[in-house]
C-alpha cells in the first residue's frame, strides 16, 4: 500500500536538499507531490517542479472550491497541497512525499492519521547562516523567519520522527533510513 510522508521543518532547515539527496540515492522510494504557492518564483525554479505558482486570487478560489488537502499562510504567502496531486500519485501506487511548513503538516496528520510526519531540525545559528547564504530574503525577513523557526521547533515532538540536519550527508542517510524503516512496517 502506498504511503504518505510529510517532511517538515523551519524555512532553511534543508527539507528540499534532504529530499533531493534521498531521491538521488533511491529514486524508486517515493515521488514528491508538488505544492501550490503564491510566493514569487526564485531563480532556478520551474512552474510545476518546485511549486505550482498561483496568483493570490487563483489560490483563494481553489481554497473556496475545497481543492486543498491543507493550506496555510506563512510569511505573507499562501502554500497548499492540492488534493488532486496527492490522489493522482497515490492512485498510481507511488509513495508520496509532501514538503510542508509545520502548520500544514499537523493539518495533514489530523486529516490522514496514517501519514508519517518527519521533522527536519537544525540549530538556529546554522539556520541563520543558511538563510543568509540563500540570498532570497533581507535581514529583517530572516530574523522574522528565525523567530517563526523557534516557535515551530516546539512542535517537533508532535511528529513521528525528527532528523537533525547538522551535516547534509549524514542527515540524508538518516532520512532515507527512516523512510525505509517506515515502508518495512
Where are these regions (language model features)?
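NTP-dependent small-molecule kinase module
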Residues: 5, 114, 129, 133-137, ...
Amino acid at each position: 500500500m502506498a504511503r504518505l510522508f510529510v517532511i517538515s521543518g523551519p524555512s532553511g532547515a534543508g527539507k528540499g536538499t534532504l529530499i533531493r539527496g534521498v531521491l538521488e540515492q533511491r529514486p524508486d522510494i517515493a515521488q514528491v507531490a508538488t505544492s501550490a504557492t503564491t510566493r514569487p518564483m526564485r531563480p532556478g525554479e520551474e512552474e510545476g517542479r518546485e511549486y505550482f505558482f498561483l496568483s493570490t486570487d487563483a489560490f483563494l478560489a481553489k481554497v473556496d472550491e475545497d481543492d486543498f488537502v491543507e493550506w496555510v499562510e506563512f510569511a505573507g504567502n499562501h502554500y497548499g497541497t492540492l488534493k488532486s496531486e496527492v490522489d493522482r500519485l497515490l492512485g498510481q501506487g507511488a509513495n508520496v512525499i509532501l514538503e510542508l511548513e509545520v502548520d500544514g503538516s499537523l493539518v495533514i496528520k489530523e486529516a490522514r492519521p496514517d501519514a508519517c510526519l518527519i521533522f527536519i531540525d537544525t540549530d538556529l545559528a546554522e539556520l541563520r547562516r543558511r538563510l543568509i547564504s540563500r540570498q532570497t530574503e533581507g535581514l529583517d525577513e530572516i530574523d522574522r523567519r528565525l523567530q517563526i523557526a523557534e516557535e515551530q521547533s516546539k512542535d517537533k515532538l508532535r511528529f513521528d520522527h525528527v532528523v537533525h540536519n547538522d551535516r547534509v550527508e549524514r542527515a540524508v542517510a538518516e532520512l532515507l533510513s527512516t523512510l525505509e524503516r517506515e515502508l518495512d512496517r
